[in-house]
Amino acid sequence: MVSTSGRKLMTEDTVRTIQEELFPLCSLITPNLGEASLLLSNPVTDIEEMKLAACELANRYHCAVLVKGGHLSGNTMCDVLYNNGRFSLFEQQKIESRNLHGTGCTLSSAIAAFAARGKGLEEAVRQAKVYISTAIYHGKDLHIGHGNGPLCHFFSGEINFVPLNSTEEVIRKFPHK
């Protein structure tokens, strides 16, 4: 609905159709800050506002909500999951990269893949975040085209999903080759 650069990607009619026809079928929606702001007609700019937004969107659409905070100010990012009346925060250091095109789509696809493998939602999100951080890290030095480039979905090495509490742990476990 809204790109990472803040640009609207669809008409109001399309957004309304998504809200009325698609969201009722979802078990999870994953709006970024701009999308959460658009859906609620209120700015969402910090973690407390993300929690309020996640709760309100979950109540409105009757599903779990992961508000993605990749564009929060500062060096730390935080995603807020609201599921069954409970918040889970996923905080990590930002990885500096201009190659972030497709992060939201990749994250939601990875969550779906881990859920399909039998993981509970919180664990699926945690493992998807490890995957996405690793793909960002391995793609940060790629020079493909102009402007925002893609993540590196083809990094080598197996990810064994042990608890990793920070981006630094991800980088140590999966060094760039």
Where do the language-model regions lie?
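Short, small-residue alpha-helix embedded
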Residues: 38, 97-121
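Regular secondary-structure segments
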Residues: 82, 108, 112-116, 129, ...
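Conserved phosphate/ATP/ADP-binding segment of small-molecule kinases
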Residues: 8-87
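Charged C-terminal helix
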Residues: 123-177
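Short, charged, surface-exposed loops that flank catalytic or proteolytic processing sites
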Residues: 43-50, 116-126
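Conserved beta-loop-beta/alpha segment of the NTase-like Rossmann-fold superfamily
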Residues: 4-5
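A structural signal for small-residue-enriched, beta-sheet-centric alpha/beta enzyme cores
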Residues: 88-91, 134
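Glycine-rich beta-alpha junction loops
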Residues: 35, 70-72, 94-96, 128-132
